[in-house]
Amino acid sequence: MSQPITRENFDEWMIPVYAPAPFIPVRGEGSRLWDQQGKEYIDFAGGIAVNALGHAHPELREALNEQASKFWHTGNGYTNEPVLRLAKKLIDATFADRVFFCNSGAEANEAALKLARKFAHDRYGSHKSGIVAFKNAFHGRTLFTVSAGGQPAYSQDFAPLPPDIRHAAYNDINSASALIDDSTCAVIVEPIQGEGGVVPASNAFLHGLRELCDRHNALLIFDEVQTGVGRTGELYAYMHYGVTPDLLTTAKALGGGFPVGALLATEECASVMTVGTHGTTYGGNPLASAVAGKVLDLINTPEMLNGVKQRHDWFVERLNTVNHRCGLFSEVRGLGLLIGCVLNADYAGQAKQISQEAAKAGVMVLIAGGNVVRFAPALNVSEEEVTTGLDRFAAACDHFVSRGSS
């Protein structure tokens, strides 16, 4: 018999780049999880906006099992039917003409930045290599993407960083305009800064970036790793704004919990990538592609996307009610089912402590920095699960406030 696994084993065996919760989930169904002791949690964290259809969705299990009974992997020397079907679904549903598949959002952003550099070098020369990104952004953990993310805490220990990356203030078109010029090859931006505090871009800001990119022959990259696949109430957030990027990255919810990422591109942009210019061993894996294809089938419907907007209203109404009682938050903001509760000045920096109280009360939430409690639940979360989970969250907030004032 194998030895029992405990949370302490993490501290003994794992490289300590995470500080996971003190409990270990072992089973999930819908928006509920149970830990090793059988305690139930309502999951409003969603695997950080990954579990778009909740845990153990029966149709996703069926898609995975069906493909698993056929074959698992061949490598990029061969294509497969599931990945081609998935590519066609993404092309039909978006602006894109071409798709590159990988395993994560970081890989998708890495591919986008490499493509942008190559596009500029091929068309205009090697002097056109500048990348403009934004402060408090997050684009992944590779050296290139962590450098593009405007959070020094994630990159400062890994110098020297890739050059020619500059950061403007988010939602400030004048700040961006001061950096974007004819040496810029790309601008990369999140339509909603997720890790940066759940901050939606303004319409004028994204339209302004599109105009600046057009003026200076730079590619506009939308990082929709967190906002994509129905999270905001549209299949992709760019559809809210009426701004079409040249490149778009997607991952997280695309696999519903199975690792998959993709770079979507126009024909013109994709044309600079030829055999051998980029690649990945596992990207386009038939298991991942079969699951992602079913995810798109289930999410890209008017009923599901309209339901996300309805659920947004459920959350915001109830969170405002909670806040009216406990007075923790200065603002509830976001789009669709990516929602942030901003702590007021009296509780600044204590988002982690609130998330820990929430877990004790039986509800899982996220943070986005020290000042924002973040919600990214399943897109099909039921009204009963919302009510139960937010009742537990309210109890956690009450306990947190009373403990602080006692």
From Swiss-Prot:
Cofactor: pyridoxal 5'-phosphate
Entry keywords, A to Z: Aminotransferase, Arginine metabolism, Pyridoxal phosphate, Transferase
UniProt modified residues of type N6-(pyridoxal phosphate)lysine: K252
PROSITE patterns: AA_TRANSFER_CLASS_3
Keyword Methyltransferase: no
Taxonomy, superkingdom: Bacteria
GO terms, molecular function: identical protein binding; pyridoxal phosphate binding; succinylornithine transaminase activity
GO biological process, one term: alpha-amino acid biosynthetic process
E.C. numbers: 2.6.1.81
This protein's pathway: Amino-acid degradation; L-arginine degradation via AST pathway; L-glutamate and succinate from L-arginine: step 3/5
InterPro entries cross-referenced by the UniProt entry: Ac/SucOrn_transaminase_bac, AcOrn/SuccOrn_fam, Aminotrans_3, Aminotrans_3_PPA_site, Class-III_PLP-dep_AT, PyrdxlP-dep_Trfase, PyrdxlP-dep_Trfase_major, PyrdxlP-dep_Trfase_small
Keyword Transferase annotated: yes
Catalyzed reactions per annotation: N(2)-succinyl-L-ornithine + 2-oxoglutarate = N-succinyl-L-glutamate 5-semialdehyde + L-glutamate
Protein family according to the UniProt entry: Belongs to the class-III pyridoxal-phosphate-dependent aminotransferase family. AstC subfamily.
Known role: Catalyzes the transamination of N(2)-succinylornithine and alpha-ketoglutarate into N(2)-succinylglutamate semialdehyde and glutamate. Can also act as an acetylornithine aminotransferase.
UniProt cross-references to PANTHER family, sorted A to Z: AMINOTRANSFERASE CLASS III, SUCCINYLORNITHINE TRANSAMINASE
Name of the protein in its database record: Succinylornithine transaminase
Source organism of the structure: Escherichia coli O17:K52:H18 (strain UMN026 / ExPEC)
Gene: astC
